């Protein structure tokens, strides 16, 4: 398998595109773990049987993107 080739069709089957507003509605400050004091905290929430995974910093970032450019 060549890891340099990104297969968008496979990605679409594995991932869901969610707007920032939808994430804000699902995960607000009342959600356990959403207000972590860690600079980057991984939060996993199950919504109707689907696991939604995101990385938090000062704002929502894609999982694994807890970087300087994502946090600020």
Swiss-Prot record:
Transmembrane segments: none annotated. There is a cross-link at residues 55-61, 63-66, 67-70 (Beta-methyllanthionine (Thr-Cys)). Keywords: Antibiotic, Antimicrobial, Bacteriocin, Lantibiotic, Secreted, Thioether bond. Its main location: secreted. GO terms for biological process: defense response to bacterium; killing of cells of another organism. It comes from the Bacteria. This is Lantibiotic Flvbeta.g. It comes from Ruminococcus flavefaciens.
């Amino acid at each position: 398998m060549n890891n340099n080739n990104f297969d968008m069709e496979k990605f679409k089957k594995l991932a869901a595109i969610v707007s920032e507003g939808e994430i804000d509605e699902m995960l607000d400050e009342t959600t356990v773990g959403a207000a972590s004091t860690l600079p980057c905290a991984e939060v996993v929430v199950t919504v109707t049987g689907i696991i939604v995974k995101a990385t938090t910093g000062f704002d929502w970032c894609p999982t694994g993107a807890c970087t300087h450019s994502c946090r600020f």
